[in-house]
């Protein structure tokens, strides 16, 4: 979740998003950015309906053409009128650079492809913060987006190699290559213990946790 002034933007809608919003006292939502169409990134979309009513209008969502097409196919009720159930989402296919604006607040965003197994997911850079949630490779041509970062939030699913996600070695290789001021490892699976990671990671690299 990104908060800039009174602009509230969520990245993906995970299955537990209602719990996360309640626990972290997030009461407003203006837009949603999607990294890709897999269920663990999207199935919480139905929990967003209260924000449609609160905002008195459709919630703008952003994603690649592939992601938006998949969302429209999987969650038709969010986009098509049905008696008694108005569409709650307005879909926007992103380009490399776009922005989200609310009143005088503007969030500038750069989007780029990353490899995630058999598909491409989208990485985002928002004002010196990069977010790469599900990824097993960042194409060389897209490393330019990861220069001069304050924070790199990066996939780190497992200790051992995985066909569609970074493991710890992969994540650290990217961190050492692009040299952000700080890095946060996310998407941690059960074989990556939080407290053990804290002991072995460099001082500027942190394991993520709920509510961070």
Placement of each model-derived feature along the sequence:
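Binuclear metal-ion centers of metallo-dependent hydrolases, dominated by the metallo-beta-lactamase
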Residues: 139-212
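Binuclear metal-dependent hydrolase catalytic cores
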Residues: 1-132, 141, 198-212
């Amino acid at each position: 979740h990104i908060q800039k002034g009174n602009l509230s933007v969520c990245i993906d809608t995970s299955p537990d998003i209602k719990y996360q919003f309640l626990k972290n006292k997030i009461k407003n939502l203006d837009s949603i950015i999607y990294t890709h169409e897999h269920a663990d990134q999207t199935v919480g979309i139905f929990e967003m309906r209260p924000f449609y009513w609160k905002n008195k209008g459709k919630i703008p969502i952003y994603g690649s053409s592939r992601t938006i097409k998949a969302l429209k196919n999987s969650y038709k009720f969010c986009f098509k009128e049905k008696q008694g159930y108005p569409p709650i989402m307005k879909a926007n296919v992103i380009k490399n650079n776009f922005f989200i604006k609310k009143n005088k607040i503007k969030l500038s965003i750069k989007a780029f492809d990353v490899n995630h197994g058999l598909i491409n997911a989208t990485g985002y850079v928002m004002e010196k913060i990069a977010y790469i949630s599900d990824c097993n490779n960042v194409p060389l041509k897209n490393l330019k987006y990861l220069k001069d970062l304050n924070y790199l939030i990066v996939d780190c699913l497992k200790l051992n190699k995985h066909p569609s996600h970074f493991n710890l070695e992969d994540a650290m290789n990217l961190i050492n290559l692009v040299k952000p001021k700080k890095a946060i490892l996310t998407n941690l699976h059960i074989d990556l213990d939080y407290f053990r990671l804290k002991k072995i990671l460099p001082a500027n690299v942190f394991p993520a946790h709920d509510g961070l």
